[in-house]
Swiss-Prot record:
Residues 1-19 form the signal peptide. Residues 20-242 form a propeptide. Gene3D superfamilies: 3.10.170.10, Neutral Protease Domain 2. The active site is at 429. PANTHER family: EXTRACELLULAR METALLOPROTEINASE MEP. GO terms for molecular function: metalloendopeptidase activity; zinc ion binding. The gene is MEP. Secreted metalloproteinase that allows assimilation of proteinaceous substrates. This is Extracellular metalloproteinase MEP. It comes from Pyricularia oryzae (strain 70-15 / ATCC MYA-4617 / FGSC 8958) (Rice blast fungus). Glycans are attached at residue 473.
Length: 635
């Protein structure tokens, strides 16, 4: 496992974020008119973790090799006499745990919010969850007297009560399944509404309802309309998950940056990069800072356990918490801290995905959705981690194992400062995961262990942090320090700021001959890459936004995002434990692969300015040789 113990801080370019914009012609429930949250079903499930599963040594079913039978026997033992069916979505996960789901029924009709899930491993019950209804079941089947309304009446009720944009005269056409219908002849929905007769647990009793399914774009609803009173909607489920985060948006480095202000962003994820959103892994949906890409929590003890640690939770997925710079101690604003950390890490996941850090490349996700690579490795984000102070770190095991980020409290000021609130810290640490997964391949996390390679690891992290904080009015004459907020030092935590000025930052490749630790070496490498960025901006312009624009060939149209793309692609091309010269060559090769070498002149000019011209040579035990020479014929 590779541990990168440094912190790198960056600010992000100031941008205007428009969250969840209204698009003309789109349909949905206006939340100001109808509060869907008022119809939200209440959770009733219990979960029995592995440590609490009763001893199974005396149970006959443990020897059964069929995990569905094992699970079924468990349900029968826990809920004797209850009618249920096996849901047909059982499978064995890549971790060897089988998952079997059950639905409670009454008179052959589903109780729609009464479920039982059993997890089986090695022929034994691993854990289980249970929300089966144990109250009174109606003595007689409603199907016998058919004393319930027509499903089209239920659609009318849902449309009226919830003010759905559906019109027309519906006609019910029977489908496979007990009392299941497609409702034809309407308009306003993406597809024909459907209705199914189900029971719903409501106020400790069962209500017979029509479950009316309507997809109206911004909302995909299951509305439980009373089967005898169309004006009574017992509950609503919305498949479309809306979440809001009150955070410093991408483009704000820290709370003291000019113009810094928190904003509330709704559903800020990129759908192509995070198809399940940030609060779902495609199987489970969460109302806390947990999802497919990351799981964020407080870790005051500094221990390795995290699943049961505290994290902010909101049933409506509204992550908005008070914070001012004067608040102290940091534990008093841990909800905001975890929210900000979760937000920044997820945005960076989505950006890197667009730049090429995908499932097959070894990115960090629970569910890779059949797109290659190994899953079950979202990033564990520990905020206010008690294992240290005045730093941060990121552990990168091979693909298929969780990355782990530890964000510490900085004690140089009163009140103390939380590194999760500085975007550059988060981006720096996450980039260690990127560079370690790409260099040498996702299965080898030891390819940045040599001194110069490890230094470049720090440099890449500084570079992505700095690239993210570029502002619209910045020029090649703009300098950026690293870590100025947490360290309370306007000069930052590096020897020199990132600058294209050889006066304000005189470092070149020859500087590495005087350095013996990774962070100073990284300062040199990131300085080189900062030159590359501005050389490409000079040719292609600047785009200050969260995500890049690509041309038809998949090339970023702006210089700042093109630089990030080439640096990322270069990581995947370079050898295990590369040196500066090899990494330079890999970036030039990346441009050749992406653009046919259209930027060769700009790249060589930038590299040569900082001593990585064509004559540069690496020497492990002697002095490396720098060169200011641009190859003939390149420019």
């Amino acid at each position: 496992m590779r541990y990168s113990l440094s912190l790198a801080l960056l600010g992000v370019a100031a941008v205007t974020v428009v969250a969840h914009p209204h698009t003309p012609g789109r349909h949905g429930v206006e939340r100001r008119a109808i509060d869907l949250d008022a119809f939200r079903l209440q959770p009733t499930a219990e979960y029995v973790p592995k440590e609490e599963v009763p001893d199974q040594s005396s149970l006959a079913f443990i020897s059964n090799d069929n995990y569905v039978d094992v699970a079924t026997d468990l349900v029968k033992s826990v809920a004797p006499g209850i009618e249920f069916r096996v849901v047909g979505d059982h499978y064995v996960g890549t971790n060897g745990v089988a998952h079997v789901n059950f639905k409670q029924t009454a008179h052959g009709i589903d109780i729609d919010n009464a479920d039982f899930n059993v997890n089986v491993r090695d022929g034994k019950v691993f854990s289980y969850g249970n929300s089966f209804f144990t109250g009174k079941i109606p003595e007689e089947s409603p199907l016998k007297k058919r004393d319930f309304s027509d499903p089209t009446v239920a659609l009318t009720g849902a449309t009226t009560v919830l003010q759905l944009p559906i019109s027309g005269e519906a006609k019910a056409e029977a489908k496979e399944g007990t009392e299941t219908y497609t409702l034809k002849g309407t308009s306003g929905a993406v597809s024909d509404p459907e209705a199914r007769l189900v029971y719903l647990v409501r106020d400790d009793s069962l209500a017979l309802t029509w479950r009316v399914e309507t997809d109206i774009e911004d909302n995909w609803l299951l509305s439980y309309v009373d089967a005898n009173n169309k004006e009574q909607v017992h509950g609503v489920v919305d498949y479309v998950s809306h979440a809001s985060f009150q955070v410093y948006p991408w483009g704000t480095n820290d709370p003291l940056e000019a113009g810094a202000a928190r904003v509330t962003l709704t559903d800020p994820w990129d759908k192509a990069s995070s198809p399940f959103g940030w609060l779902s892994d495609g199987t489970s949906t969460y109302t806390t800072t947990r999802g497919n890409n990351a799981i964020a929590q407080s870790n005051p003890s500094g221990g390795t356990a995290y699943l049961n640690n505290y994290r902010p939770t909101n049933a409506n997925s509204i992550f908005s918490y008070p914070w001012t710079p004067a608040m102290s101690p940091p534990s008093s604003f841990v909800d905001f801290s975890a929210t900000q950390l979760f937000y920044t890490a997820n945005v960076f996941h989505d950006l890197l995905y667009k730049l090429g850090f995908t499932e097959a490349a070894g990115n960090f996700q629970v569910n890779n959705n059949g797109k290659g690579g190994l899953g079950n490795d979202q990033v564990i984000l520990n905020t206010q981690d008690g294992s240290g102070t005045n730093n941060a770190n990121f552990a990168t095991p091979p693909d298929g194992q969780n990355g782990r980020m530890r964000m510490y409290i900085w004690t140089y000021t009163t009140p103390q400062r939380d590194s999760s609130l500085e975007a550059g810290v988060v981006i720096h640490e996450y980039t260690h995961g990127l560079s370690n997964r790409l260099t040498g391949g996702p299965s080898n996390s030891g390819c940045l262990s040599a001194l110069e390679a490890g230094g470049m690891g720090e440099g890449w992290s500084d570079f992505f942090a700095t690239a993210a904080r570029i502002k619209q009015n910045d020029t090649a004459d703009t300098d950026y320090p690293m870590g100025e907020w947490v360290a309370a030092n306007p000069k930052g935590i590096r020897a020199y700021p990132y600058s294209t000025s050889l006066t304000r930052n005189p470092q070149t490749y020859a500087t590495t001959n005087t350095l013996s630790t990774v962070h100073p070496i990284g300062n040199v490498w990131a300085t080189v890459l900062y030159e590359v960025l501005w050389a490409l901006v000079g040719k292609h312009g600047l785009q200050v936004s969260t995500f890049p624009t690509f041309d038809a060939s998949g090339v970023p149209t702006s210089g700042n995002f093109l630089a990030q793309k080439l640096v990322l692609d270069g990581m995947a091309l370079q050898p295990c434990n590369p040196n500066f010269v090899q990494a330079r060559d890999a970036i030039i090769d990346a441009d050749q692969a992406l653009t046919g070498g259209a930027n060769k002149c700009e790249l060589w000019t930038a590299f040569a300015k900082r001593g990585l011209g064509s004559g540069a040579k690496y020497a492990a035990s002697k002095r490396s040789v720098e060169s200011k020479t641009i190859p003939a014929g390149v420019c």
